[in-house]
Amino acid sequence: MTINSLDAQKPFTTADGSTIRSILDRTNAPVEKQSLAEATLPAGGATERHYHKLSEEFYFVLEGTAVMEIDGEEKNVSPGDGILIPAGAWHQITAKSEGLRILCCCAPPYSHDDTYFE
């Protein structure tokens, strides 16, 4: 059994610019097919627009509000919203006036090498 505490995970900045604490991934658990992380953005902050060739992502908004853009379509998101980002879809999330905290699940697991920019 593997149980990892969020508080024990060291934050790092991903290629898209968000601050991540990886809860379960290949670096800290016997994970093969997915990863789970907390991502944060400061008020007004945004990820760089990007896509992943291999990974499908789920975002789940924990705190804050944001504008989610996927392949040119924009929607407002808030706590309790789940977002599907298909593999190959261009996407960007922009925090509104307060900071943003989300859970992010990637399958296959997140990799810097699978992040592509405009």
Predicted regions and their residues:
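A short, N-terminal "cap"/entry segment at the start of jelly-roll beta-barrel domains
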Residues: M1-Q34, E48, T115-E118
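Short, charged/polar surface micro-motifs in flexible loops or helix N-caps
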Residues: A29-E32, P42-G45, T65-V67, P108-S111
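Conserved short histidine dyad/triad with adjacent acidic residue
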Residues: A37-H52
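Histidine-centered metal-chelating micro-motifs
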Residues: A46-E48, V67, I83, A87-Q92
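Glycine- and acidic-residue-biased ligand/ion/polar-headgroup-sensing regions
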Residues: L54-E56, F60-A66
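Structural motif
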Residues: T65-V67, E74, W90, G99
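Short acidic-glycine-tyrosine-enriched beta hairpin
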Residues: E73-A87
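Ligand-binding loop in jelly-roll beta-barrel domains
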Residues: A87-H112
